[in-house]
Every structure is written in C-alpha cells, then in structure tokens.
A protein has these predicted regions:
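Interdomain motor-coupling "hinge/lid" segment immediately C-terminal to the ATP-binding subdomain
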Residues: 3, 12-115
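Conserved beta-strand termini and adjacent loop/short-helix elements that scaffold enzyme active sites
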Residues: 10, 34, 146-148
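Accessory nucleic acid-recognition modules appended to NTPase machines
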Residues: 68-182
Length: 182
C-alpha cells in the first residue's frame, strides 16, 4: 500500500450503487464482492465441520464464534439492519414492517420456485412492489435468484426463478439449507 493511501472497507451493498449515482468515484474505489465463507475456503474435512457451517452460516462473525445463540442473534441483527438501514436508504418504502414480513417469509421458500404472485397475495401488495423489493434485496446481496436451466418447452409457460440467501443460517429446513449452501 502506498504511503498516505487510505482504505475504507464497508459491509454495505450501497457502494455498488454509486456506479449509478451522480457522484463519480472513478479511480477512487475498487468494488470487491465478498461472499460468505465456503467449504473450500474453510478447509472442511469432516461431517461435523459441515454441520457447523450449515448451522452457523458462512459469515465470519457467527461461524468463528461457534455458538448457536450468537449466530441466531447475529442473524436477527443482520436482517434488522438490512431493512432499517440498507433498504430504507435506497428505496422509498413506507411500510418497513411489511418488508420485514417478506424477508421473514423468504427463507422457508428456498429451493422451490419463487412465485411473486403468491407473495403478493400473502402480503396484500402490488406485484410491482414485491418485485421491486426482491430486486432491492438482490442489489444489497441479501438474496440471489437463479433462473431454471434449459430452454422452455412451451413458450407460453414461463418457469419461476428459485432464490437463495447469502446468510444460509436463516433457512429453516435442513435439506433446503444444504441446497442454499451448494
């Protein structure tokens, strides 16, 4: 590092959005996407190691703490900060409580096709609102969506995407949590 060089490390997805904003940060920052720790990065070799990763999640703080209670508390705080600070600063959302309900509903749906229409009906919101909130969660690296692999057999039938969480510890079902990890 050069003398006098200053580095800012942030855990926010907001820096990624500066590319689309009015202020130019050209040459003043480098965007690095840090994903949760993987099996290979941790050098896991036993089934117990894998169980710990599945139970605690791949984020460094809860994983290295090695404590289920700490991991649950960290996960709750992460979700709350995501809604109250990150999403609220990027989107004009009037009803943060309903957004929290959406975020609370999503982990149970990992591994199955994500129907925006079903979520819309559950939350009594407009389709556009739910789609916008899901996009905001993607931009902030809370979730990511994968489209089905392969060409559609019938053009009129469009398959829904599946979604997964960067914080896999929030997924309640063991098999879905394993799918989320992979």
């Amino acid at each position: 590092r050069a003398s006098g060089q200053r580095i800012l490390v942030t855990g926010s997805g907001r820096l990624d959005l500066y590319r689309f904003g009015g202020d130019s940060l050209q040459g003043r920052y480098h965007l690095l996407r840090l994903h949760p720790l993987s099996v290979a990065e941790l050098g896991l070799t036993t089934a117990n190691d894998l169980r710990d990763l599945l139970a605690l999640g791949g984020f460094p703080e809860p994983y290295f703490a090695g404590n289920d209670a700490f991991a649950r508390r960290w996960s709750r705080e992460y979700g709350s900060r995501l809604v109250r600070e990150e999403v609220a600063s990027l989107e004009r959302i009037v009803d943060l409580g309903t957004l929290e309900l959406l975020i609370g509903r999503l982990p149970a749906l990992v591994g199955s096709p994500l129907s925006i229409n079903a979520l819309r009906e559950d939350l009594q919101l407009a389709h556009r609102t739910v789609a916008s909130w899901l996009s905001a969660l993607e931009r902030l690296y809370a979730i990511f969506r994968l489209a089905p692999f392969g060409a559609p057999r019938i053009r009129a039938v469009r398959k829904e995407q599946k979604h997964y969480h960067f914080n896999g510890a929030v997924v309640p079902d063991g098999s879905a949590r394993f799918e989320n990890l992979v």
